[in-house]
Design a protein with these regions (language model features):
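Hydrophobic alpha-helical transmembrane segments of membrane transport/permease proteins
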Residues: 22-73, 162-202
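An internal, D/E-rich "acidic patch" concept
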Residues: 1-8, 43, 65-121
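Transmembrane alpha-helix boundary and packing residues in multipass membrane permease domains
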Residues: 27, 31, 74, 125, ...
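Hydrophobic alpha-helical transmembrane segments
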Residues: 48-63, 154-167, 212-217, 254-271
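Hydrophobic alpha-helical segments embedded in or immediately adjacent to the lipid bilayer
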Residues: 122-123, 135-187
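N-terminal signal-anchor/first transmembrane alpha helix
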Residues: 1-65, 95, 99, 126, ...
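Alpha-helical transmembrane segments of integral membrane proteins
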Residues: 6-10, 102-135, 151, 182-342
């Protein structure tokens, strides 16, 4: 085993050791927050029309009649086994809700991240290279302005302009009714399902429905990426390695991409990855705005109905996803820059 792979392995084990207490703290917070909510969650979720006997039966089935420490142990066991109980409002297994609606959220967030990086990195690199020019000023203005707009407001503007005034794109749902009826839910990511079934003619409809919510969410995140890339490229351009590359007669584009950007990559990866985690919270508002059938839309539905069993399961998965993304960012940084490992 080489020293490089050995140091990377030690770094991975160290990060995993830190993740365990972090996850335990997060799970404890989720459990406590769900238990301090006012009122009886069983009665509230079912409309308050239960008799006392029916309420007792429901509480026993959900485990709410047991001591808190027993409920906490049961909750940790559910996390370990991946079984989060059954929703109170529609009697669906929470894992089924996560599988069916989580795929739509994954499709939206991944598409939004591609747009954020595709817009933010080139624009930030250009602004960092052309410091104190009109291009730089416009890039800075874009970064501040686009990130300051609430994602739901930008979504409403996009719906108004492209859906109602210009009538170019659909403004809600994941697909038209006919297309959705044709597809078999192999993965619940409809574009992928269409490819699996060979329904290539349905893909334009699916892309049209995906475009507005993905662009809305992606543009908001791109504001952070632009400013981050600009600052780090500007700092990297002052390095001796950049001057050495120029002295060798390399083209300015090569100097920026291969030398300045590469050395600015670690903080860019870190913050961009954290923005990917924050996409989950932005996806909740985006899904509600565009009636996108993702897990965020379901979360709002269950919150409105005070179905805390469903809410607890969804928030738990969100929290674990954020921790997993953070761990992945650390590993990518350690791979890109060996100095991070020590």
């Amino acid at each position: 085993m080489t020293s490089t792979s050995g140091s990377l392995r030690r770094y991975l084990l160290t990060r995993l050791a830190l993740v365990v207490p972090m996850v335990l703290i997060l799970l404890t917070l989720v459990f406590v927050l769900m238990r301090v909510a006012p009122g009886n969650p069983i009665e509230a979720a079912l409309g308050g029309h239960l008799t006392h006997a029916q309420l007792v039966v429901r509480e026993r089935a959900a485990g709410y009649d047991r001591p808190l420490i027993v409920q906490y142990g049961q909750y940790l066991g559910q996390v370990l086994t991946g079984h989060f109980g059954t929703t109170l409002t529609d009697q669906r297994p929470v894992t089924q809700v996560l599988a069916q609606n989580g795929a739509a959220t994954l499709e939206l967030t991944m598409s939004a991240m591609v747009i954020a990086v595709g817009v933010g990195i080139p624009l930030g690199m250009l602004a960092g290279r052309l410091r104190d020019t009109l291009v730089d000023a416009l890039a800075r203005l874009y970064g501040i302005f686009i990130y300051a707009i609430p994602v739901f407001f930008l979504g409403l503007l996009a719906q108004l302009l492209f859906g109602h005034i210009l009538n170019w794109l659909p403004t809600s749902s994941q697909a038209s009714v006919i297309v959705q009826a044709e597809l078999q839910p192999h993965t619940n990511i409809l574009i992928l399902d269409a490819m699996i079934d060979g329904q290539w003619g349905d893909i334009p409809d699916l892309l049209a429905h995906l475009l507005l919510p993905a662009v809305t969410l992606g543009l908001v995140i791109s504001g952070v990426v632009v400013r981050l890339v600009r600052v780090n490229v500007m700092q990297a351009m002052k390095g001796d390695y950049v001057e050495a590359a120029r002295a060798r007669g390399l083209r300015e584009r090569t100097v920026v991409v291969r030398h300045a950007f590469k050395n600015a990559l670690v903080p860019i990866v870190t913050v961009t990855g954290l923005q990917a985690a924050l996409l989950l919270s932005g996806a909740v508002l985006t899904e509600e705005t565009f009636n996108w059938p993702g897990i965020g839309n379901e979360l709002i539905y269950y919150l409105e109905n005070r179905d805390y069993i469903a809410v607890q399961g969804i928030i738990t998965v969100f929290a674990l996803a954020v921790v997993a993304i953070s761990l992945l960012i650390d590993l990518i940084n350690a791979w890109v820059d060996p100095r991070v490992r020590y």
